Amino acid sequence: MKNLPILLLLCVAACSAYPLDRSARDEDSNMDLLQDYLEKYYDLGKEMRQYVRRKDSGPIVKKIQEMQKFLGLKVTGKLDSDTVEVMHKSRCGVPDVGHFTTFPGMPKWSKTHLTYRIVNYTQDLPRDAVDSDVEKALKIWEEVTPLTFSRIYEGEADIMITFAVREHGDFFPFDGPGKVLAHAYPPGPGMNGDAHFDDDEHWTKDASGINFLLVAAHELGHSLGLYHSTNTEALMYPLYNTLKGPARVRLSQDDVTGIQSLYGPPPASPDSPVEPSEPEPPAPGTLAMCDPALSFDAISTLRGEILFFKDRYFWRKTFRTLVPEFHPISSFWPSLPSGIDAAYEVTSRDSVFIFKGNKFWAIRGNEEQAGYPRGIHTLGFPPTVRKIDAAIFDKEKQKTYFFVEDKYWRFDEKRQSMEPGYPKQIAEDFPGIDSKLDAAFESFGFFYFFSGSSQFEFDPNAKKVTHVLKSNSWFNC
């Protein structure tokens, strides 16, 4: 019996260790899930992986807050039980922040009649049921727009509809039953516009499995150019809503506003009487927004939005709503001047830098940062530089390009110093950009240079201008 206490101690130690090990495994699993979720849907760069395990790390807390806010959760910045539960839910595979492909500008079809083709079928549903649900899903969008659709049975359609499993040729493999249900691509040639459905799911016509009509209507919204909505009642909300049966597949006002901002309302029926009415006065900024001669003082991104500055105002544009808001600069940042010269965002620092004359300011969200304004010469400019015409931050290289008349400088954001060997001639390294610049910014890997009422889309890898557009083309004018 002398060994009994030892055996009891061993038993206590083993029994006590088990729940601790299990808890540690659960936490590791949640951390892996968080990293995967943020990388897939919230544009978490691979260089940020090292911070994921440090849950109190500033950048990771901000990403968790961003996710919680987007999905309508309580914003805590912590990996709480509600957040973990949501990350386990079935959803669309299209990112909530960031995008599958690099495409410039605002994605929309340039025509109103589109073709679609059902390339193959799931074994879960009869073929005529799939045909009927795809037709119904397109009809939902057709009823509120000028768009019409016709089916083709061979060749390349605008929208190719496919069932697939795991790796299926687009570098975004499915993950088996649950989690990612489907994904779709924005309007454009090739694979763009196509919708892919995970055939490992159990597709149904009712709510007993994954309702195909509900998911198809959502994915085809992406095929028409819509992004995810933060409105939990919207069809374009990213999470699969198990409470919505086939009878409840309908558009919210948020969905209607989004799609009509791209294509407008449906044409009036010739048989419908039109009641005379007094014309409504235009909203502030509307006429100026679509003025063909419109130019901008400065442009910058801000947490996924784009800010277009003009005089003492700015337009605030998001990729989810596509309808720009119009505000006085002072309503968000009272100390900022009007008539801004240049602006750019350093995403890794969550800061936007605003330039006017020989001074610059820093803002974070709607907060102005202490210690500003500072002189532009603290960045390393020579005394001869009196003002900045435009600036672009290259996220991939972590460099900022400053454009002054016909020259440019490059600033290393990591080292916080101007690089040697500058200035250089703009025309030499940016062929085709030979006008004096008013504004510039980066979007989806392209640089956009603005001069007067024109903008030049520039591919920095190919070093060439790819499109010349009106400056206000971002406003869907």
UniProtKB/Swiss-Prot annotation:
Chain segments carrying region Disordered: 260-285
Main EC class the enzyme belongs to: hydrolase
Glycan-carrying positions: 120
Keywords of the record: Calcium, Collagen degradation, Disulfide bond, Extracellular matrix, Glycoprotein, Hydrolase, Immunity, Innate immunity, Metal-binding, Metalloprotease, Protease, Repeat, Secreted, Signal, Zinc, Zymogen
Active-site residues, record numbering mapped to chain: 219
GO BP, sorted A to Z: cellular response to amino acid stimulus; cellular response to reactive oxygen species; cellular response to UV-A; collagen catabolic process; extracellular matrix organization; innate immune response; negative regulation of phosphatidylinositol 3-kinase/protein kinase B signal transduction; negative regulation of reactive oxygen species metabolic process
Residue positions binding Ca(2+) 1: 124, 199, 201
Catalytic activity: Preferential cleavage where P1', P2' and P3' are hydrophobic residues
Binding residues for Ca(2+) 4: 297, 389, 438
Propiece residues: 18-99
Molecular function in Gene Ontology: metalloendopeptidase activity; peptidase activity; zinc ion binding
Intrachain disulfide bonds: 290-477
Keyword Repeat appears in the UniProt entry: yes
Residues at which Ca(2+) 3 binds: 175-176, 178, 180, 198, 201
Cofactor(s) of this protein: Ca(2+); Zn(2+)
Hemopexin repeat residue numbers: 287-336, 337-383, 385-433, 434-477
Signal peptide: 1-17
GO cellular component: cytosol; extracellular matrix; extracellular region; mitochondrion
Function, in words: Metalloproteinase with a rather broad substrate specificity that can degrade fibronectin, laminin, gelatins of type I, III, IV, and V; collagens III, IV, X, and IX, and cartilage proteoglycans. Activates different molecules including growth factors, plasminogen or other matrix metalloproteinases such as MMP9. Once released into the extracellular matrix (ECM), the inactive pro-enzyme is activated by the plasmin cascade signaling pathway. Also acts intracellularly.
Domains as described in the record: The conserved cysteine present in the cysteine-switch motif binds the catalytic zinc ion, thus inhibiting the enzyme. The dissociation of the cysteine from the zinc ion upon the activation-peptide release activates the enzyme.
Protein's name according to its UniProt entry: Stromelysin-1
Organism: Equus caballus
Organismal lineage: Eukaryota, Metazoa, Chordata, Craniata, Vertebrata
